[in-house]
Amino acid sequence: MVAGKRTGAAKGSRHNKKYWRKGTNIDDIEDSIHIKSRQAATGGVISEMKDEDLFIVDRTATANKPVVPKLTKKQQAALEKITKNITQEHVTLPKPSTTSKILKKPAKLPRGNAILALKKGPKAAAPAAKKKNFDVWTTDLTPKIPKSKLENQEAAEHFLKVVKKKQPKTPGKSITSLLPAVQIAEGGASYNPESAEYQEYVAKIAGEEQKLIDHEAKIKAGIEPQWEKVTTEHERFLEMAEGLRIHPKYGKDDEEEEEAGNSEKSMKTGGEAEPKSQRVECDRMTKEQKKKKAKAQKLDKEEKRRLEEKAKEQDSHNVYRTKQLHKELDEEEKQRHEESEVRKKEKLINKLTKRQQLGKGKFVDAEDPFLLQEELTGNLRQLKPQGHVLDDRMKSLQRRNMLPIGGDKEKRRIKNRLKSKVVEKRSAKNIVKGSRVI
């Protein structure tokens, strides 16, 4: 313990009355006296001044005065009840017992400005803004980048990621066809169609059926011979049963004379008939024809030479028109490029709208279902079912190039003409000087 220094116990307790004068801070008292003297010198002590000297009441009328709505009967009765409770004398209530576990606070009644606000009535509600019709298909849902972020691409990317507006990268979808997945049937195929639509629909199906019948008749007519009569089995049997029959045009005597004449001729020639040699005649050209031919050949040669000279002269002149030639070539190249772009578009459209050969089979479209006039019932209970959903789905997938069509397997074709291969046998090799056995 250091000598000459008093401890806390020796100083005395701070809770006693003797410590009040010892523990007072003189600096706070001096500051308050200084502030009061300064206020008195400038205009007066603020704590001693009245409210009228300190504040000014603004009594000018406001431009937009709030509209005070009229109170209903219920609101007027409630307001009178509240004002009556306020004007009544205050009654002291006994202090609640501390033994109760739950202390309930009394409801606070409106006082002062709250009563004036109730007299004025509730504020007029602002007109609610009408909600705009939101259309998913026409509204542009792409995220908008603020103008402050447009200058920096990294800031824009970061903004979209933080705001959760940037969509994740997804693999591209391959579109196989632009055709609709489900084809809606025409009005004439209904169970209760209109007369005009039904007639048009049935006429179209009848026309397709007539085309098929005509095609089959054409094939059948092409198989049968046109100018010959095909003999049936019964006609062939009758012909064989008749035996040998001589035509009435030829008689027996004529045939015997012809046979005798032929035998005499063969005896004279010694049994061999020499064929007669026919004289071959060839037309010779006259002198005038030869002169005309030579003159025509000479004119052809001169014309050919003249055209060659003209082509050479034109090539020599092309040196001085290089700009025009370049321009013509550029225009030709531009036109060729435009034509190629058009071909590419047509090719893409055909690929997405037409059938492709995905299998060995051939695509045959399903027949359109139809009902006869006596089968039209007018209600679904008595309707005769036609077609099948699975058949429609199968045809739809094949039409949209999503399913191959099976067919006969292609047979392996063997070449008729085989390649010749030269093979030199060891026993037939030529032995020359310097050869050795391997």
UniProtKB/Swiss-Prot annotation:
Composition bias, Basic residues: 12-21
Domain of life: Eukaryota
Cellular component per GO, a single term: nucleolus
Alphabetical list of Pfam families matching this protein: Nop53
Entry GO MF terms: 5S rRNA binding
Similarity section: Belongs to the NOP53 family.
Function: May play a role in ribosome biogenesis, being required for integration of the 5S RNP into the ribosomal large subunit.
Protein name: Ribosome biogenesis protein NOP53
Source species: Caenorhabditis elegans
